[in-house]
Amino acid sequence: MSDITKEQVVEFIAGMTVLELSEFIKELEEKFGVSAAAPVAAMAAAPAEAAAPAEEEKTEFDVILKSPGANKIAVIKVVRALTGLGLKEAKEKVDGTPSTLKEAVSKDDAEEAAKQLKEAGAEVEVK
């Protein structure tokens, strides 16, 4: 095995676009015969009693771009910074509103993302 460290692999993956990362995950699934969606299926099969306490405080939030507002270019820049998408992908997200920009993030991260988008002139919803 070569002298590549785990940190170098993590840094390389962190520099990938969402599209590149998606393709990378598909290749890994094919190579090793696994599915990244398997844990989700296991959670869906859990007993309904475990999901009963619906009054629990929500810990994961989604940031949804409702409208880019008047300053679309500034919103695209913020979307790129928040998501790591390329220019084309970020523009498609902004043009295709409403669109989910971040999923299952902490409350602080969701509020910070919403704040940045609102400052750029976008209409944002945090669910």
UniProtKB/Swiss-Prot annotation:
Keywords: Ribonucleoprotein, Ribosomal protein. GO terms for cellular component: cytosolic large ribosomal subunit. InterPro entries: Ribosomal_bL12, Ribosomal_bL12_C, Ribosomal_bL12_C/ClpS-like, Ribosomal_bL12_oligo, Ribosomal_bL12_oligo_N_sf. GO terms for biological process: translation. The keyword Protease does not apply. It holds the Pfam family Ribosomal_L12. It comes from the Bacteria. Residues 96-127 are annotated as: Disordered. SUPFAM superfamilies: ClpS-like, Ribosomal protein L7/12, oligomerisation (N-terminal) domain. Forms part of the ribosomal stalk which helps the ribosome interact with GTP-bound translation factors. Is thus essential for accurate translation. NCBIfam families: L12 (TIGR00855). This is Large ribosomal subunit protein bL12. The gene is rplL.
